[in-house]
């Protein structure tokens, strides 16, 4: 055994060394040099300083500008809410624990932090799925003409929270558990142990299949079909400037959406899967810590991709930041509502 399992923790260091200590009671400087914990704290502070203003500004701008309160934008706001949850209840806790060098908030704090971080990440992921399905239905028209209404948007938002709770809540009630991971400064589901008391293996398989592989498959399928449909429409209207512009916008958005998600979450999912299928194998604290903390950057990717690339959102943000005047001089009233809505107009009849 190359790790030490204790009460609600697993340390990737054999107890034969005599160094392993509870991550709830002692600094974990035997796992990594103190400067690495300080560097981690600086990194989390950086994410907090960027993540909270970006997501908070998204919510503020939407509240101030009625023209942004359109059905499709509800999902974008849902992404900002998820990002805000991750920043407030995940990043701040990790910043505090990294400064101390161990999870000073104890098992209960670990469970809360792990739950909130998982909940925020899953809400964001399933929001992307809802956006993907909406685009597929509106543009590819598998159901004929379809108008995305406010009721559909609210149902989509509710769906994201139900699915996120279905993933994040089980460890709180005994199906698996949240424990410190990596450098023991943040918490996540228990991929590490075979503890039959918590049925860890069944939960991890459920989470990987239903809350990672399934949503990723849906996103790839729907956006793959979307790109093909837009390309076909563009080929039939070679002289249509709006169609060509829509094709470029869709292609750019698809690439950024897929890359943003894969860059943020695939390293973490891959390492977690390796640890799960190789229980007891030797690995360093940094081996899990690096992808775990890198995945947290997704709280920054989403508002940048889904809001800052949206011209109407961008203009409204500038108007809010500059006290009612847009320094770029763009006329908001003439701006197309969203690049996504613009794409709808090029779907084949």
UniProtKB/Swiss-Prot annotation:
Compartmental location: Membrane
Tissue specificity remark: Retinal double cone accessory photoreceptor cell outer segments.
Gene Ontology MF annotations: G protein-coupled photoreceptor activity; photoreceptor activity
Cysteines engaged in disulfide bonds, as pairs: 110-187
GO CC aspect terms: photoreceptor outer segment; plasma membrane
Posttranslational mods: Phosphorylated on some or all of the serine and threonine residues present in the C-terminal region.
All ranges on the Extracellular side of the membrane: 1-36, 100-113, 177-202, 277-284
Topological domains, Cytoplasmic: 62-73, 134-152, 231-252, 310-349
Primary localization class, coarse: membrane
Membrane-spanning parts: 37-61, 74-99, 114-133, 153-176, 203-230, 253-276, 285-309
Keyword Disulfide bond among UniProt keywords: yes
InterPro entries: GPCR_opsins, GPCR_Rhodpsn, GPCR_Rhodpsn_7TM, Opsin, Retinal_BS, Rhodopsin, Rhodopsin_N
Residue list for modification N6-(retinylidene)lysine: 296
Ion transport keyword on record: no
Keywords for this protein: Chromophore, Disulfide bond, G-protein coupled receptor, Glycoprotein, Membrane, Phosphoprotein, Photoreceptor protein, Receptor, Retinal protein, Sensory transduction, Transducer, Transmembrane, Transmembrane helix, Vision
Bilayer topology: Multi-pass membrane protein
General function of this protein: Visual pigments are the light-absorbing molecules that mediate vision. They consist of an apoprotein, opsin, covalently linked to cis-retinal.
UniProt family annotation: Belongs to the G-protein coupled receptor 1 family. Opsin subfamily.
Descriptive protein name: Green-sensitive opsin-4
